[in-house]
Amino acid sequence: MESTELWLWLDEANGYSQVESNPYLHELKDKIKIVSWNVEKEIVGTPFLKIKEYIHAAKNLAAKGDDFRIISLYKYGGLYFDLDVMFLKDFTPLLKGHEFVYAWEYQPYANSAILYLRKNSYITNYLAKKLQKRKAAMPWVLFDYKDKKLANLRNYPCTFFDPLWGGYCEGMPLSKFTDFFKEFGDGFDKKKTINSYKEFFPGAFAYHWHNSWDAKEVENSYFGLFNREFNQILNNNKQYTNF
């Protein structure tokens, strides 16, 4: 992507304080911007200060993540994406167009796992007001298709960013999300046509593997194949956003 700066937000108390001791973050710190997230500080001077009791209320991590993406994009603008997403194509053409979310199969609301909002835009300001009013940031609350004020928020097909979510189709390299981390062999073979992330779901902009945080890193897997490729790109000092 052109002139892109990648920010990794880490909770100030649980994550950011371990930046120097975390080997995975240490190897990335010169290539991306690692930023501390303290919601109490971030809502100062914003409309969210009016609902600080809701913001600070006990929530599960998913709900906190829903709050985070709206607050951060309101303040800074940009493209939010979940960390279980792998980019397959340059997003530049999408970022030059409308602000967007993507469809969540047949649900009557959009998925905000990938969400592009511009700072101080009509849609961004409206979503901030809606969050204040509803005191909830879940996608079925904020991104309900019945909300006509979101008519100009582009809703891309699910297959653009989540090609396996709608189910397996003949020719796909995977039939289950966990297959992304599965070792090749015993009837599960790598497709001969896939030797790069560029050939993995070539019609999609991204692949969303949906959690699997406890999956083992297997070298002889699709994850291992692409992990080596991305490491090589980084080690060769190429632009990490150059797709």
Spans of features found by a protein language model:
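Glycosyltransferase-associated regions of secretory-pathway enzymes
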Residues: M1-G65, L83-F243
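Small-residue hinge/turn detector
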Residues: D67-Y76
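Active-site acidic Asp-centered loop
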Residues: Y76, F81-D82
